[in-house]
């Protein structure tokens, strides 16, 4: 297998297991991983997106916070932009999403982990992301919200975000919860990373 064959095999396996969305990323979001320039991210992701688009009828998501990567991925067949910085890292990405009229997943994240009232602060941060979307011309029906489990949160805060995830529905958008293999699952259930599929 080359990398493309491996990715296509994995996508097929996930779809057979019931996946609704195939999320493709060219930069690891795990703690401690290095920044990847947009050009390299594009080289890594576009062949995979094109390959999946040719073979499968499914929603393809591009996991990026970079406008240049999002633009190339949409052109290649992605219909969802999964931005782990909630439109706050690249000023142009909201415009790319608005112009293409694709869906976007706005994840909660922040560089500062000091919260006064955790849920209130998290919702205020997500509200800022939604305002950036609105200003760019992204309609509410294009938006999915993600509480960002595993990002800028303690174990206790992650568990609170999971337990109170229903509160995010007050924004009037669907909510996506990504917990599989995250460290909060490992710490809560005392499991190694390869045994965390309960997430």
Give the role of each language-model region:
Residues 15-16, 20, 127-142:
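Phosphate/pyrophosphate-binding loops at sites that engage ATP/ADP/AMP, CoA/4′-phosphopantetheine
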Residues 143-152:
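Conserved strand-turn element in the central/C-terminal portion of the radical SAM core barrel
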Residues 19-22, 50, 60:
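Residue-level marker of intrinsically disordered, low-complexity segments enriched
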Residues 9-25:
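Catalytic domains of carbohydrate-active enzymes, especially glycoside hydrolases
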Residues 1-10, 29-51, 56-57, 64-67, ...:
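Active-site-adjacent loop and "lid" segments of alpha/beta metabolic enzymes
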Residues 59-61, 142-144:
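Residues at or immediately flanking beta-strands
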């Amino acid at each position: 297998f080359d990398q493309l064959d491996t990715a296509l095999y994995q996508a097929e396996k996930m779809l057979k297991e019931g996946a609704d969305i195939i999320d493709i990323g060219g930069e690891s979001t795990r703690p401690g991983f290095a920044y990847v320039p947009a050009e390299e991210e594009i080289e890594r992701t576009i062949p995979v997106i094109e390959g999946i688009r040719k073979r499968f009828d499914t929603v393809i998501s591009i996991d990026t916070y970079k406008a240049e990567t999002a633009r190339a991925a949409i052109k290649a067949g992605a219909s969802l932009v999964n931005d782990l910085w909630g439109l706050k890292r690249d000023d142009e990405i909201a415009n790319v999403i608005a112009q293409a009229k694709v869906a976007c997943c706005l994840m909660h994240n922040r560089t500062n982990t000091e919260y006064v009232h955790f849920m209130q602060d998290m919702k205020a941060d997500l509200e800022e992301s939604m305002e950036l979307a609105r200003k760019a011309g992204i309609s509410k029906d294009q938006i999915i919200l993600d509480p960002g489990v595993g990002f800028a949160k303690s174990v206790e805060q992650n568990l609170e975000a999971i337990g109170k995830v229903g509160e995010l529905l007050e924004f009037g958008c669907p909510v996506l919860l990504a917990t599989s293999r995250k460290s909060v699952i490992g710490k809560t259930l005392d499991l190694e990373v390869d045994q965390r599929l309960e997430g």
